[in-house]
Amino acid sequence: MKRIVSVTAVFLCGISLLQAQPVRVSETLKELDMENISVVEKRDTITAAFKTSAYRGIYNGIGIAIRHLVAIPEIPTLQLLILDNALPQLCITIPAELVQKYQAGECELDEVYRKMGMTTSTETAVRQLKGVKRKESSFGKVDLVVYPNVMLVNNVTYKLYKAALELQPAVEMQLWKGASLRMQVSLPIVSNEDGKW
């Protein structure tokens, strides 16, 4: 009887450890303010989908996510699916051996970036995530963004015809998969056209 109880306890501990890695990945992405997070582990690969809307520039957000995810101990192969308006745009694969080398100090983060696989073919990652519930959905969230606009118009090579600097505040919201709403106004700051503003 004791043997059955101990085998069952070891089995349950093993199952909880298997479930711990996807939870760690999900929590790490949540702490980094990523949106539309989906994480699943299948066949020694953790597939995670997310949107990097909180960071200036999508690639900056991807780099920050990779830096934090490869630091998670005992992480298997990572397959990252980058989303834009809830549509998959990029699939990044980081092999477990590369993560282990980085954690052991045998390679730098730059080498991880150089050796990771990157493709726009996202079908396999999307199939892995089919049926997985999304966390931190961006649906209905309103973002306030300010875009600077610099305009230089030259119709002839020897004279600057028009120059202007504008601020363009916008309210953006994701509606459904692949669709977003942007309401934007243009506020002129400086212009070389007399009487225009």
Predicted regions, residues:
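Sec-dependent N-terminal signal peptides
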Residues: 4-15
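Sterically constrained small-residue positions within well-ordered secondary structures
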Residues: 11, 39, 135-137
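Generic detector of short, well-ordered, non-transmembrane alpha-helical segments enriched
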Residues: 16, 44-45
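N-proximal, solvent-exposed amphipathic alpha-helical segments enriched in charged/polar residues
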Residues: 20-43, 55-57, 116-117
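Flexible, glycine-rich linker and terminal segments associated
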Residues: 22, 88-90, 96-127
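Transmembrane beta-barrel domains of bacterial outer-membrane proteins
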Residues: 45-91, 123-197
